[in-house]
Design a protein with these regions (language model features):
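Alpha-helical substrate-recognition element adjacent to the catalytic core
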Residues: 2-126
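Cofactor-binding loop segments of dinucleotide-utilizing enzymes, especially the Rossmann-like FAD-
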Residues: 92, 151, 182
Length: 188
């Protein structure tokens, strides 16, 4: 493959009904996030950083009522049909959802034979997508073109850092980053 196409899952390929609870030390629910913006606000909260409050990701272990985001899945469908492109889904969820994600992608008629799902949630952080993509470029020097789709501004910023490094080191010729807002990819 000479091109790497990387997609986030939630709010990028599909809208899902996942909620993340914020718990106090006794396990009481303090608040519930239903989208990326709410999660990002909480992630920056001092009480989360200090460990006074914590996220409960258990609901993310299953994919609930996914709704296809056609503007993005059409791109994925196109890339999957191209033998020079390696398609990946990189998600903040845990690997327990990998089979569900494969089944969903299969159900919307995108071939999954060569689809690679990387679940970052097992590493205890839903971040670091830039570092992950950079490590792929180091391992597979034939990849000269990268495209990345995600609805999280933090992930976009992280991947843009990897992009700058990869372009500076002439590892790639093209590295396009898209922020998906309300199901529409916009160059970021």
């Amino acid at each position: 493959a000479t091109r790497l196409s990387v997609f986030d899952f939630d709010e990028t390929l599909a809208f899902t009904e996942a909620e993340i609870d914020i718990l106090d030390q006794e396990g009481n629910v303090i608040d519930t996030t239903t989208n990326q913006e709410e999660y990002d606000k909480w992630e920056d909260d001092e009480r989360i950083k200090s460990g006074e409050l914590k996220f409960d990701y258990s609901e993310l272990d299953v994919i609930t009522n996914p709704t296809e985001i056609v503007a993005v899945t059409d791109i994925m469908r196109d890339r999957s049909a191209d033998s020079d492109t390696q398609v990946m889904i990189v998600t903040a969820r845990s690997s327990r959802t990998s089979d569900d994600i494969h089944r969903y992608i299969d159900a919307i008629n995108i071939p999954t034979d060569d689809l690679y799902v990387k679940a970052m949630g097992d590493e205890g952080l839903g971040r670091g997508k830039g570092g992950f993509i950079f490590s792929i470029l180091e391992e597979f020097p034939d990849i000269r073109e990268v495209e990345f789709y995600d609805d999280s501004q933090k992930n976009i910023t992280d991947v843009n850092t990897a992009k700058a490094q990869a372009l500076e080191q002439e590892m790639v010729d093209v590295f396009d980053v898209y922020l998906v807002i309300d199901g529409v990819p916009q160059k970021a």
